[in-house]
Amino acid sequence: MSENYRAPIVVVVGHVDVGKTLLLDKIRNTMVAYREPGMITQHIGLSYLPWPIIEKYAAPVIERYRLKGKVWVKGFLMVDTPGHAAFSNLRRRGGSVADLAILVIDLTRGFEEQTYESLILLKSRNIPFVVAANKVDRIYGWKPIPNASILDSYNAQDEETQGRLEEALANIIMDFNKQGFEAERFDRITDFSRQVPIVPTSAVTGEGIPDLLVLMAGLTQRLVKDRLRLVGGPGKGVVMEVKEEKGLGTTMDVVLYDGVMRKGDTIVAMGLNGPVVTRIRMMVMPKPLDEMRDPEDKYMHINEVEAAAGVKVIADGLDDVVPGSSVYVVQGDPKPYIDEVVKDAASVKIETDQIGVVAKADTLGTLEAMVLYLRSQGIPVRKADIGPVTRRDIIDASVVRRKNPLYGVVLAFNVKVPKEVEEEAKVQLVTIFQNNILYRLVEEFTKWFNEEKSRLIESELSKYVRPGKIAIIPGYVFRRSDPAIVGVEVLGGLIKPGYRLVKANGKEVGVIMQIQDKGKPIQVAKKGMSVAISIEGNVIVGRHIKEGDVLYVNVPLEHAVKLIMQYKDHLSSDEVEVLEEFMKLRSTWKAQAQ
């Protein structure tokens, strides 16, 4: 059965500090302890875990579910680097090279920022995933049983400890429900195609890891079988990383997911400045651990590699290649392959005339993930491209800034901003946001956006007379006229110097000259404040106005219409109430005048 199928590629994702690396290390190290010589093979960026080793390690779980002899999965190719960047680069148009994901969630903390980010990415790339609810050993009162099935460990705990675990799981299940997913503890799942299985694990004690690996084999056979069928022919892969290696020059780490790649083959990948067509001079893979005598001499040369595999490719012109790009082995005319990589890159890059931010990222994969996340947060994108921030990006952002200052910015994810570009940004008044963690970058921008929006709206609102309602406080008449000085309570809205006051019957009272609070002049008094005001105009307290009278700010009609039609959402609820009350009074004055 397994002959025409490759091993599934598995990626580990989740929030920072949830134990992704520790979990991966625990799985790998435990496997090493069970291995026979030559069984575990190290790839570039991937570790191959053969099923026979898993079978030994997870024997009690396999026995419990009577799976002996029923699993045809060869093993798992685990992506060595956990997290978003690696997962983002495991991309191909319309999906992912990863077949399965482990979403690690801290059992004691539940959903966190990057949990949501991971879910958006998994959903968009349509990848089945299993949840490792990690740090079960941190549950108060938990008595660990190293490397045991989580069900055996669970049954060995007292009732109170079991209850604490159930409560933590219930919170995670609730978080999934809020995101539109149905989730359940793995042994209670009734439909794996609809429900998300959760396995409590500990990267420290190894508990739950046997269940996790057996569950992954089951999901592979049930949900991703067709993805694993090998078509054969010329190799197809994705570029994970491009880096300088001592003694080798610029190298390209490739995950080959179909076909064959040979030394001497012509390959096509996408570069920063267009397609790169080159010939493979050399391919290397890591030596088996037991053959690695010298850290400097860690690679073995290979002439041919079959999918699925992780391989380091050495060729000319690789400096320009973009991680996350597709890579194809050329057979015959290279043009169709060139068209394909161009089309692939174009599906990620964006250039429009619309109002939106300029997004820059270091790889095609991270750019794709970035645009996806920005859109999920309701942030429009005008331009998305790879590489350091350039002067051209600043000009593009400044064009947007002139139309909408809130979106005329550059978001730089994991890329450099040259000094001269920073200077240009200062001249053009363009703000650059820079961070290596996507959600923090978006968080910084959103915080600035909201503050800037409030500032701009306040600046716009300052052009209009705002609604206000005051009552003259009995016993607080300091001067009867020329100007009248009285103590007032602001019943709703606000008052400012220069605002005209009217009575409820429409009679003009005068203009507020000054507002004082505890003897000091202030520029604005809001609802709930008691202040002294001086009123200029032909007004005498006791004749034109009396103690206890309610007065209104006389909002000009065009201001009132603008405030209601355009800025209602930005006024406080008491301002809206006073404005509506004032408009009703105003309509009665009009009727009386007729």
UniProtKB/Swiss-Prot annotation:
CDD domains: aeIF5B_II (cd03703), IF2_aeIF5B_IV (cd16266), IF2_eIF5B (cd01887)
Region (G5): 202-204
Region (G3): 80-83
Binding site for GTP: 14-21, 80-84, 134-137
One term of GO molecular function: GTP binding
Any one GO CC term of the record: cytoplasm
Family annotation (Gene3D superfamilies): P-loop containing nucleotide triphosphate hydrolases (3.40.50.300), Translation factors (2.40.30.10), Translation initiation factor IF- 2, domain 3 (3.40.50.10050)
Stretches for region G4: 134-137
Cited PROSITE patterns: G_TR_2 (PS51722)
Annotated region (G1), positions in chain: 14-21
Key words of the record: GTP-binding, Initiation factor, Nucleotide-binding, Protein biosynthesis
Annotated region (G2), positions in chain: 39-43
Occurrences of domain tr-type G (ranges): 5-224
Function: Function in general translation initiation by promoting the binding of the formylmethionine-tRNA to ribosomes. Seems to function along with eIF-2.
Family designation: Belongs to the TRAFAC class translation factor GTPase superfamily. Classic translation factor GTPase family. IF-2 subfamily.
The protein's name in its UniProt record: Probable translation initiation factor IF-2
Lineage: Archaea, Thermoproteota, Thermoprotei, Thermoproteales, Thermoproteaceae
